[in-house]
């Protein structure tokens, strides 16, 4: 192989490596059709830490019983004006609608509703 051919092949290889690096380094994001169900809550006066934890743990239990919930987020890093934030990711809007009044939701409400002072719910999707 002559030196010009080697240089051309080396140049092509370097160009390919550079192109792969550019593709890997691109900021990619998606717009999934899942639904984030976000609940902010202020607990009733006198609610114990054990009661709060039972309500939060109840979300994990509910997610294990209802197939429409993909993920949960239960550990807020910053909370303003409320005591807790809980997030459930539903597979899609139909899964969120089907969740209402399920046995899993009713079971969780038995723990959550008695200690809930105020709450706001936000549902977000694409």
Pin down the residues of each PLM region.
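Hydrophobic alpha-helical segments, especially transmembrane helices
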Residues: 7-8, 53, 98, 106
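Short S/T/G/P-rich N-terminal loop/turn motif that feeds into the first structured element of a domain
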Residues: 17-84, 91-101, 123-126
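Conserved catalytic core of Hanks-type protein kinase domains
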Residues: 89-90, 115
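C-terminal partner/receptor-binding element of secreted or periplasmic proteins
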Residues: 114-122, 126
């Amino acid at each position: 192989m002559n030196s010009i051919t080697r240089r051309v092949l080396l140049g092509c290889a370097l160009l390919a490596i550079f192109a792969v690096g550019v593709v890997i380094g691109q900021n990619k994001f998606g717009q999934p059709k899942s639904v984030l169900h976000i609940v902010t809550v202020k607990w009733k006066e006198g609610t114990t830490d054990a009661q709060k934890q039972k309500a939060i743990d109840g979300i994990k239990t509910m997610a294990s019983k209802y197939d429409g919930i993909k993920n949960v987020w239960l550990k807020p890093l910053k909370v303003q004006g409320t005591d807790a934030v809980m997030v459930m990711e539903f597979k899609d809007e139909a899964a969120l609608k089907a969740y209402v009044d399920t046995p899993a939701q009713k079971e969780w409400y038995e723990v959550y509703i008695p200690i809930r002072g105020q709450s706001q719910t936000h549902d977000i999707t694409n």
